Amino acid sequence: MSHNDTIVAQATPPGRGGVGILRISGLKARDVAQEVLGKLPKPRYADYLPFKDVDGSALDQGIALWFPGPNSFTGEDVLELQGHGGPVILDLLLKRILTLPGVRIARPGEFSERAFLNDKLDLAQAEAIADLIDASSEQAARSALNSLQGAFSARVNHLVEALTHLRIYVEAAIDFPDEEIDFLSDGKIEAQLNGVIADLDAVRTEARQGSLLREGMKVVIAGRPNAGKSSLLNALAGREAAIVTDIAGTTRDVLREHIHIDGMPLHIIDTAGLRDANDEVERIGIERAWQEIEQADRVLFMVDGTTTDAVDPADIWPDFIARLPKNLPITVVRNKADITGETLGISEVNGHSLVRLSARTGEGVDVLRNNLKQSMGFETNMEGGFLARRRHLQALAEAANHLEQGKAQLLGAWAGELLAEELRLAQQSLSEITGEFTSDDLLGRIFSSFCIGK
């Protein structure tokens, strides 16, 4: 579809509401105003007017806002009609607007896409609009707003600018070898490169925090039947999300709860008790449990403290540990401390966290909450933080890899040309975040996930 078309869409959620908003953007927005309102409202002033049908009768009445381009969200002429939020009224008004030539329904995210294409937003800011709408916590919303206001983009642009200056110095020295500049050995380039690498590492750390806020962490509770997995799910969720009985195999399917710990979203998954089951339904539940374990960010290995004194996971259940994906983090949870009399708290055993608690009474659960937060490197106080997506983390990682490769070329092979190429590739990876070097296919995938009226 052409970006020269005029587009229209409902900007408020579907259904009944006090106010319903239609947004129009493009060259024909002026014609829509003349036809529907009978006049062109004063720019950026609210005008209370009837919204007219083809025959001149009123369909509704409400507020009209006129934003002539380029001083608008999309950079084009934009008209907003704010009427009553009844679906029938909005549908009649939308059909009236679509009778005008050159006007069509907007695709999902097309308003934000046009803002990006018209340099009103960079790509990271455009993505932040969707993240702000989808934010599941106050901290996620604040970080998304920071991204929308350019906090993330500013950090990326600072890195790109630093790389630009470094490339200029390196490539000038390559192009003018007769000048008395021994750029490979004077230490200046290495110092500047180390500075950029350090700055990039800091941005990556903040981006991982932002990704946690946006994506959350998937935590799977796994263990033998009757270890207290469902009781722990209920304790973490703060409600009776799962049925708890003394009958082994009560949980036969996957149960999911979405919770927050100091603003960090967690996807907690309770699974069927792992054992050799004869029941077909229970076997299916166990298969699903292993599927969830293989996709987890962390496993809470639930142990009934009344059945064993062992604390090393390899001693508790070696077959279970052997089947876990390599490098999957584990927190061993020794449950039923209210019965065993074990001291509540946390310790380290062979590189694994060990938490002693009682899921039934809730004692020690706060220790586990803090362990989950710290295990992901999450910090509660993130003033000025920003949200990040997986593609951002990937681009930052690629840039870091190119800088390390460039440093190796500088110090190991004294290869200035190869260093310059690695710097260029690092710069390109960073520019993909803000959209300076981004394929049309990626843009389509990003904006198609937006709301229709955004």
From Swiss-Prot:
Its cofactor is K(+). Signal peptide: none annotated. Its main location: cytoplasm. GO terms for molecular function: GTP binding; GTPase activity; metal ion binding. Exhibits a very high intrinsic GTPase hydrolysis rate. Involved in the addition of a carboxymethylaminomethyl (cmnm) group at the wobble position (U34) of certain tRNAs, forming tRNA-cmnm(5)s(2)U34. Homodimer. Heterotetramer of two MnmE and two MnmG subunits. This is tRNA modification GTPase MnmE.
